[in-house]
C-alpha cells in the first residue's frame, strides 16, 4: 500500500484484515471525468473487487447520489476544487501578462527573440508543473477525507524538493500495466501523446496550453507546495527546462479577464538575469570571480608600447613587468595593442614575418628583421638585429656608445612598425595611433616621430606618451653624441642640458620630455618628487615647464602570477596555496615550509622578516645592516634575497655567519624563492631612499604580508600608515632614511604582531582585499591616451 500512496493514485483501498491479497485477484477500471457545472467536479469509479474481506471504497458524485461517505468529505472536495480553479485562473492571468511583457520587449529590442521563446517554454513548463501539483492535491485531499489519518495523514505535496513532475514514455506505461495489475495511474500527464482532458469551464486544458502531440521529455522542474505556487515565474538562478512543443492557440476563457494580483517586476528581472545565468554556467572553474573590465567604446585606439625589456621574455626590473602586463589590460578594454621589444634570444612563440628593413646608425647600414607572436590578445613584435643578440643576461651591457647605437636603431625601427609589420595580416597604420615609450632607452621615439614625420605632415594623428620609471638614468653623454642620433641640427638644443657639476651635456631624456605629447610617472608621489631639485636629477626645470602634460599613475600587478591562491611556486616542498578564507591555515604552513627550506628553526610564534630587492644604496640595504643587531635582540628571524654591490653582498654573508640560527642571506636572485619569501614572511622591509613605484610592497599585501616602508614615491601612495584607534591603514611607514626611524616603525609592527592579533588580522584582510590589478591602471592610461589624441 506504500507504493499506492507514494504514486498518489486516486483509488485507495482500506484493508480490513491482515491477510495478504494477491494482486492477480484485483480488477480495476478507468476513472472518467465528466463536465460539471462551474465550481464542482465529478469523479466516477468502479469499486475494487477484493473478496469478502475487502470493503469497497467509492468516489463521491456531485449529483447527489446516495453514498455512505460523510457530507463533510464531500464539502472538503468541493472546496478543494474551487481553490484549484482559482489557482488556475491566477496562473493563466500571469501567463497572459508574461506574454504581453515579452511581446513588448521584442518590439522595443528585436535581439530578444530568443528570450521570448525561452519565456514561453518556461511558462508552459510552469503550467504543466502547477497542473500536476493541483490535481495531485485533489487526489490526496480526497484520500484524506476517506481514509484513516493515521495511514495517510500527510500529503505528498508537503515534500517540497523531493516531489518532481515527469512524463514517462509509452513503453514505461505498458511495463507498469503488466507488472502491477492492482492499480492503474489516472494522472493526466502519464501519456506523452495525449494531453489532459481536465475540464475548465467547458474547455479542456489542451485548448489553452500545449500542442496536440507533446514529445517525451526528461524530468527537470521541481514541484513545490500549493502555498508557494502563487508566482509562476521560475527563479532566475535555477531555470527549468520546458517542452519544446508548447504554444498558445485558443483565446482565454471569459472568466480570466480579471487583472492579475502579482506584479510583473519579477518577470522583468527574470528577462534581465537570463543572460547572466547562461554566462555564469559557462565560466571555467577558478575564473568565475574574474570579471572583464568595461570596454573603451568610442575611445578605442591602436596602442604600441615600446620598451627595452618585457616579461617574461626579458626582465631586469619593474619596467619588464609593466611592459608585460599593462598591454594585456589595455587589450581587455578593447584596444588593439602591440608591444615592441628587442629580440635578445630565440623565443619559441615568435615567428619570422619575413619583413626586412635597413637603417643607418653612426654612418653604418644595419638590417633588422621582425618576429611576431600573438599572446593574450596582444601582438608582441620582436626586432632582431646582430646588435641585440646574445644580450639576454645583460641587456644594458656594453660601453656608453654601444648602448646608444642600439637604442637609436631600436627607436628608428619601432617608429615604423605600424607601416611595415602586418600583425594578423593587417598593419596598424598611423591613424588613431598612440606610442607609449618607456624610460630613456626609448625616449628618442617621440623625437623621431616629430622630426621625421609630423614636421613633414606625416603621421599627423599619431601621438606619443613617455613614461618615467626611474629618472636617475637619463642617457647622458658629451654634446658630441648628438651626431649618433641622426637628427637635423636645430634639434641639438632639445638635447642640451646644463649640469652645475658637469656643465653642458647631451641628455636623451630631456629631449624626450620636450617632444612627448604626454608624460607619465609610475606613481603620484613620484610625479611630485621629480619636480623638486632633489628628486628631478637635473631635469626638474624641464618637468616644471611642461607640468601641464604630467600625471602620475600607480602601477598594478599581475594578479594571476602574484596570487597566493594560484601561485605555482607554492605547490611543492610543503608549501600550500591559500586565500583570505583560509589565511590562518595556509600562511603559517608556508612560513614553516620556508623556515625548513632555509634551515631556520621552525617556530610559528617568531616574526619572520623578509627583504627582496637589489643590493644597492637606493634600496636602503645599509639601513637594514645598521638595524640588524637590534632586530636579533628582539627574537625575530630575517631573510634577505638580492644581488648588487659587492660590499653589500658581503654584508649579507657576514650577517648569516654571525646569526646562524636567526638570519639567512641569499646572494643572487630566484623567482621561486621570491614568491616563497613573500608567502612565508610575516613582514616585508622596503627602506628605499627613493622608489618611483615599487612592486614588492604590492605583492606582499596581496599575500597577507605586512610592509614596513620608507614613505617616498610609490611607497607613500600604496602603503597607508596603520592607525590603531580607527583600525585603518595597511602597514607602517617612516619619514626619513635613518636606521633609528626604521627601528621605531619596525618596533611598533612587532608589538602589534605579538600583542594585538585582531589588529594584525585586520591589516592582512585590508591588504588582501585591495584591487591591485592592472585593470584600474589601464583605465587611467586610457584617459591619458585620449587626452593626447585630442591635443593639437
UniProtKB/Swiss-Prot annotation:
- Record note on disruption phenotype: Reduced plant growth under short day photopheriod conditions and starch granules with alterated morphology.
What are the BP-aspect GO terms?
A: amylopectin biosynthetic process; starch biosynthetic process
Q: Where is this region: Disordered?
A: 105-295
Q: GO: which molecular function terms?
A: alpha-1,4-glucan glucosyltransferase (ADP-glucose donor) activity; alpha-1,4-glucan glucosyltransferase (UDP-glucose donor) activity
The keyword Membrane appears for this protein: no
Transit peptide residues according to the UniProt entry: 1-55
The record ties this protein, via InterPro entries, to: GS/SS, Starch_synth_cat_dom
Known tissue expression: Expressed in roots, leaves and flowers.
- The UniProt annotation places ADP-alpha-D-glucose binding at 315
Q: Does the keyword DNA damage apply?
A: no
User: Primary place of residence?
Assistant: plastid
* Top-rank lineage group of the source organism: Eukaryota
Q: Name one GO cellular component term.
A: amyloplast
Give the compositionally biased regions (Low complexity): 179-192
Enzyme category, top tier: transferase
Q: Which UniProt keywords apply?
A: Amyloplast, Chloroplast, Glycosyltransferase, Plastid, Starch biosynthesis, Transferase, Transit peptide
**Record's family?**
Belongs to the glycosyltransferase 1 family. Bacterial/plant glycogen synthase subfamily.
The protein's name is Starch synthase 2, chloroplastic/amyloplastic
User: Which organism was this protein described from?
Assistant: Arabidopsis thaliana (Mouse-ear cress)
Amino acid at each position: 500500500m506504500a507504493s499506492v500512496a507514494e504514486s498518489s493514485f486516486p483509488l485507495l483501498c482500506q484493508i480490513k484484515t491482515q491477510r495478504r491479497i494477491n494482486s492477480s485477484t484485483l480488477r480495476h477500471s478507468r476513472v472518467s471525468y465528466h463536465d460539471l457545472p462551474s465550481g464542482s467536479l465529478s469523479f466516477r469509479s468502479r469499486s475494487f473487487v477484493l473478496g469478502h474481506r475487502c470493503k469497497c471504497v467509492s468516489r463521491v458524485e456531485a449529483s447527489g447520489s446516495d453514498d455512505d461517505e460523510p457530507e463533510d468529505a464531500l464539502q472538503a472536495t468541493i472546496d478543494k476544487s474551487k481553490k484549484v480553479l482559482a489557482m488556475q485562473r491566477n496562473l493563466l492571468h500571469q501567463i497572459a501578462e508574461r506574454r504581453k511583457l515579452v511581446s513588448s520587449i521584442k518590439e522595443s529590442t528585436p535581439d530578444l527573440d530568443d528570450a521570448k521563446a525561452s519565456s514561453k517554454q518556461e511558462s508552459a513548463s510552469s503550467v504543466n508543473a502547477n497542473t500536476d501539483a493541483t490535481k495531485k492535491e485533489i487526489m490526496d485531499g480526497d484520500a484524506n477525507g476517506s481514509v484513516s489519518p493515521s495511514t495517510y495523514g500527510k500529503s505528498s505535496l508537503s515534500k517540497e524538493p523531493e516531489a518532481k513532475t515527469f512524463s514517462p514514455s509509452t513503453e514505461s506505461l505498458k511495463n507498469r500495466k503488466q507488472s502491477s495489475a492492482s492499480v492503474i495511474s489516472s494522472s493526466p500527464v502519464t501519456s506523452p501523446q495525449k494531453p489532459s482532458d481536465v475540464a475548465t469551464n467547458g474547455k479542456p486544458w489542451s485548448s489553452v496550453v500545449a500542442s496536440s502531440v507533446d514529445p517525451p521529455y526528461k524530468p527537470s522542474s521541481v514541484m513545490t507546495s500549493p502555498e508557494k505556487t502563487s508566482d509562476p515565474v521560475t527563479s532566475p538562478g535555477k531555470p527549468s527546462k520546458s517542452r519544446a512543443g508548447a504554444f498558445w492557440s485558443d483565446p482565454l476563457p471569459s472568466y480570466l479577464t480579471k487583472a492579475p494580483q502579482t506584479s510583473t517586476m519579477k518577470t522583468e528581472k527574470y528577462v534581465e538575469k537570463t543572460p547572466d545565468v547562461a554566462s555564469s554556467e559557462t565560466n571555467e572553474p577558478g575564473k568565475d570571480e574574474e570579471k572583464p573590465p568595461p570596454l573603451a567604446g568610442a575611445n578605442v585606439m591602436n596602442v604600441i608600447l615600446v620598451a627595452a625589456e618585457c616579461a617574461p621574455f626579458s626582465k631586469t626590473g619593474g619596467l619588464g613587468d609593466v611592459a608585460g602586463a599593462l598591454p594585456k589590460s589595455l587589450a581587455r578594454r578593447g584596444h588593439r595593442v602591440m608591444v615592441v621589444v628587442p629580440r635578445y634570444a630565440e623565443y619559441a612563440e615568435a615567428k619570422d614575418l619575413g619583413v626586412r628593413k635597413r637603417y643607418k646608425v653612426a654612418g653604418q647600414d644595419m638590417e633588422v628583421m621582425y618576429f611576431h607572436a600573438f599572446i593574450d590578445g596582444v601582438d608582441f613584435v620582436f626586432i632582431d638585429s646582430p646588435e641585440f643578440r646574445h644580450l639576454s643576461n645583460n641587456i644594458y651591457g656594453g660601453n656608453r656608445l654601444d648602448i646608444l647605437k642600439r637604442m637609436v636603431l631600436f627607436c628608428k625601427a619601432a617608429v615604423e612598425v605600424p607601416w611595415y609589420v602586418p600583425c594578423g595580416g593587417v598593419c596598424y597604420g598611423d591613424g588613431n595611433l598612440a606610442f607609449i615609450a618607456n624610460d630613456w632607452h626609448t625616449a628618442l621615439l617621440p623625437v623621431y616621430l616629430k622630426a621625421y614625420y609630423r614636421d613633414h605632415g606625416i603621421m599627423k594623428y599619431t601621438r606619443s606618451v613617455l613614461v618615467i620609471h626611474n629618472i636617475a638614468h637619463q642617457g647622458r653623454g658629451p654634446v658630441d653624441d648628438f651626431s649618433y642620433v641622426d637628427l637635423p641640427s636645430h634639434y641639438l638644443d632639445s638635447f642640451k642640458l646644463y649640469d652645475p657639476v658637469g656643465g653642458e651635456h647631451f641628455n636623451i631624456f630631456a629631449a624626450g620630455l620636450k617632444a612627448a605629447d604626454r608624460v607619465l610617472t609610475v606613481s603620484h608621489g613620484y610625479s611630485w618628487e621629480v619636480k623638486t631639485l632633489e628628486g628631478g636629477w637635473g631635469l626638474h626645470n624641464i618637468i616644471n615647464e611642461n607640468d601641464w602634460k604630467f600625471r602620475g599613475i600607480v602601477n598594478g600587478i599581475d594578479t594571476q602570477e602574484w596570487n597566493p591562491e594560484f601561485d605555482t611556486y607554492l605547490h611543492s616542498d610543503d608549501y600550500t596555496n591559500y586565500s583570505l578564507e583560509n589565511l590562518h591555515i595556509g600562511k603559517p604552513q608556508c612560513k614553516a615550509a620556508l623556515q625548513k627550506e632555509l634551515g631556520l628553526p621552525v617556530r610559528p610564534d617568531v616574526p619572520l622578516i623578509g627583504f627582496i630587492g637589489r643590493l644597492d644604496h637606493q634600496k636602503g640595504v645599509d639601513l637594514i645592516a645598521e638595524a640588524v643587531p637590534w632586530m636579533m635582540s628582539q627574537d625575530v628571524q630575517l631573510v634577505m634575497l638580492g644581488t648588487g654591490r659587492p660590499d653589500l653582498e658581503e654584508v649579507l654573508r657576514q650577517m648569516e655567519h654571525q646569526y646562524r640560527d636567526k638570519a639567512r642571506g641569499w646572494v643572487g636572485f630566484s623567482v621561486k624563492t621570491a614568491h616563497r619569501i613573500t608567502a612565508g614572511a610575516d613582514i616585508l622591509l622596503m627602506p628605499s631612499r627613493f622608489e618611483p613605484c615599487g612592486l614588492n610592497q604590492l605583492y606582499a599585501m596581496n599575500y597577507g604580508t605586512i610592509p614596513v616602508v620608507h614613505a617616498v614615491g610609490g611607497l607613500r601612495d600604496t602603503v597607508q600608515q596603520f592607525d590603531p584607534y580607527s583600525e585603518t591603514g595597511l602597514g607602517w611607514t617612516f619619514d626619513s632614511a635613518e636606521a633609528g626611524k626604521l627601528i621605531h616603525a619596525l618596533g611598533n609592527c612587532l608589538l602589534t604582531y605579538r600583542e594585538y592579533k585582531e589588529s594584525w588580522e585586520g591589516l592582512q584582510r585590508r591588504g588582501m582585499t585591495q584591487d591591485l590589478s592592472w585593470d584600474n591602471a589601464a583605465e587611467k592610461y586610457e584617459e591619458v591616451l585620449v587626452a593626447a589624441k585630442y591635443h593639437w
